Amino acid sequence: MPSVQKSLARLALACGMLPIAAVTADHDSSRWEKYIARFQAADKKQMPPPGGILFIGSSSIRMWKTLKQDFPGLPVINRGFGGSQIADSNHFAGRIVHPYKPRQIVLYAGDNDVAAGKSPETVLADFQQFVKTVHGKLPKARVSFIAIKPSLSRWKLSGKMARANSLVSDACGKDKRLDYIDIWQPMLGDDGRPKPDLFLGDGLHLNAKGYALWTSIVKPHLARRE
């Protein structure tokens, strides 16, 4: 879709004139095919039992190597693929979401979306489409959105990221099956900027201390089996 058409589409979306799927129709997810194939190969060897808690999204999920240790006693599944956007998780939902029949999906994405030039409104639209895709097959599943994190390397985009978080938070407040997990404020120091000691040397990805903070915030949001 040419850039002018994209702009018009986003305007129409904001006015409620366009289906949310239309904005992301031209997104190409093919670059992730080999990673998804690896997940499916692993599933053929040992399929996670249904009713688990699926973590999905970009590198902050992929690099969460201590996920199982951080949430002992909970059936967590890691299906993060680094560099991905919300639209990619939506595109592959039929292969790495629906088959697991999870009771909860914890999504971290949106960071790369904003860095790639997507507007906060488009981030919201993509999230809404992901939710629609999930609930089309799993109507009772809880979808939890981990807020886009503030980072040293992308601080210049913090205004757009905060706006996207606000939009998603508002949307989550309108559906009891949705959950917004705020990690934004806890990652900021007294100066209002990201705490450097939470990051690896690249100023983008989390270190062990960063994941420990996330664990403490995310844990109360995880759904135990009823």
Where are these regions (language model features)?
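Conserved beta-strand scaffold positions in the cores of enzyme catalytic domains, especially
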Residues: F55, V76-N78, Y180
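N-terminal secretory targeting modules
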Residues: M1-F55, I61, K65, Q69-D70, ...
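Oxyanion-hole/transition-state-stabilizing segment in secreted/luminal serine hydrolases
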Residues: I61-I77, I86-L124, S144, I148-L152
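Cell-envelope and extracellular/periplasmic
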Residues: G80-S84, V106-S119, Q128, K132-H135, ...
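Catalytic His-Asp segment of secreted/periplasmic serine-dependent ester chemistry enzymes
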Residues: L152-E226
